[in-house]
């Protein structure tokens, strides 16, 4: 009934298959919670299915086990306005690393995953997937800690995927905000955007060997994120594919990758792409980013080969700040309708579209920031992950 609370007794719950089903209301959600947050340990082959409306799951811990085949936590296709919060999934790995299951699967619409810790996935399958159909889902993923994920050595090691190739021309309206991605090295795509109208806002990507990739779909935005790469091998920034993508206000520090893993990579495309191929970049807008110590700050027409022959059309690179790059600009294929203006650079030769660095920037909290827009990085001012899991993490600039 609306307002009901189901309290799980503290201790180990081994191989539990929990089907949390109900219909709450906005004013009176139904809650499944731990007697003491973090003290309910779901071990063995436990799984959780969230199935209904206005449901809240709070304070659980999955550890010392693995799933036999099903995803660990699933929001069902009919689930709406429901929430997974203050919960941990840690090292929930099978012996067989080729076994594919996701740790969180989001179906339905208007659901939220927040203040969780999801760390240590080392087997096949994306960590968290938003599954799309022909309608927008408006999910929200915020204030989570996504901990280290080692390189998988195959496709399917993303930390987050939004959509699938089959529905990539549909819109998701999904927000990923105020999360920490710490050494998420599963594959080249840390976040793989495969749908339209998504926002990746104000996240920290710390020493990750990968990129945030506009893989399929159009009209998405990656803005005000922090990529603190510290020259880690294969670290990357943002990879652009598709139409009307926006890359604004990001801070990229010592990104060591090249071409597809450069600080900002604008890709070439197939002339007649299938849904799962590389679509032409059109009207990319890249502004107000601060790039410090990158191996390659910008790569245009990246990935050009015998198949990817179609250059970007309409690329605006304006009002960015680039400090001490190894290489400022690489052009693998010349975009049509390229606009580059008012970009300020220090520590590299001036080329068309770039001018000598002025005095717009100021160092604050170890980060170069615009003097008119000084702010404290969110992870220094906001609680991330479960309230009961006191991890002493520090994210330093090297």
Swiss-Prot record:
MF terms (GO), sorted A to Z: poly(beta-D-mannuronate) lyase activity
Catalytic reactions of this protein: Eliminative cleavage of alginate to give oligosaccharides with 4-deoxy-alpha-L-erythro-hex-4-enuronosyl groups at their non-reducing ends and beta-D-mannuronate at their reducing end
Record keywords, A-Z: Lyase, Signal
Keyword Thylakoid: no
Pfam family, one: Chondroitinas_B
Enzyme class label: lyase
CDD domains with a match to the protein in the record: PL-6
Protein name per UniProt: Alginate lyase
Organism: Pseudomonas sp. (strain OS-ALG-9)
Chain's gene name: aly
């Amino acid at each position: 009934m609306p307002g009901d609370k189901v309290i799980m007794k503290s201790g180990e719950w081994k191989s539990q298959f929990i089907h949390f089903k109900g219909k709450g209301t906005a004013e009176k959600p139904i809650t499944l919670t731990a007697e003491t947050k973090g003290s309910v340990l779901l071990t063995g082959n436990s799984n959780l299915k969230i199935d209904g409306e206005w449901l809240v799951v709070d304070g659980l811990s999955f550890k010392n086990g693995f799933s036999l085949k099903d995803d660990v936590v699933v929001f069902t296709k009919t689930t709406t306005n429901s929430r997974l919060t203050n919960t941990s999934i840690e090292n929930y790995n099978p012996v067989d690393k080729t076994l594919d299951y996701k740790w969180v699967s989001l179906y339905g619409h208007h659901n939220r995953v927040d203040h969780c810790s999801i760390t240590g996935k080392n087997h096949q399958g994306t960590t968290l997937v938003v599954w799309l159909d022909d309608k927008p889902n408006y999910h929200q993923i915020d204030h989570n800690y996504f901990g280290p994920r080692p390189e998988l050595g195959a496709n399917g090691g993303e930390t987050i995927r939004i959509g699938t190739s089959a529905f990539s021309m549909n819109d998701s309206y999904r927000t990923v905000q105020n999360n920490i991605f710490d050494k998420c090295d599963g594959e080249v795509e840390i976040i793989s955007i495969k749908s339209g109208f998504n926002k990746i806002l104000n996240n920290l990507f710390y020493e990750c060997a990968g990129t945030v990739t506009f893989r399929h779909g159009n009209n998405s935005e990656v803005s005000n994120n922090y990529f603190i790469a510290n020259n880690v091998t294969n670290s990357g920034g943002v990879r652009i594919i598709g139409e009307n993508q926006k890359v604004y206000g990001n801070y990229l520090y010592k990104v060591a990758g090249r071409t597809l893993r450069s600080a900002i990579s604008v890709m070439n495309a197939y002339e007649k792409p299938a849904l799962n191929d590389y679509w032409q970049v059109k009207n990319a807008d890249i502004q107000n980013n601060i790039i410090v110590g990158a191996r390659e700050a910008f790569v245009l027409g990246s990935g050009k080969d015998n198949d990817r022959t179609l250059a970007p059309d309409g690329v605006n690179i304006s009002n960015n700040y680039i400090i001490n790059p190894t290489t400022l600009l690489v052009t693998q294929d010349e975009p049509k309708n390229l606009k580059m203006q008012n970009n300020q650079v220090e520590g590299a030769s001036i080329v068309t579209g770039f001018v000598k660095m002025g005095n717009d920037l100021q160092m604050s909290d170890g980060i170069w920031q615009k003097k008119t827009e000084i702010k404290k990085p969110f992870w220094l001012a906001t609680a991330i992950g479960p309230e009961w899991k006191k991890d002493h993490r520090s994210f330093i600039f090297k």
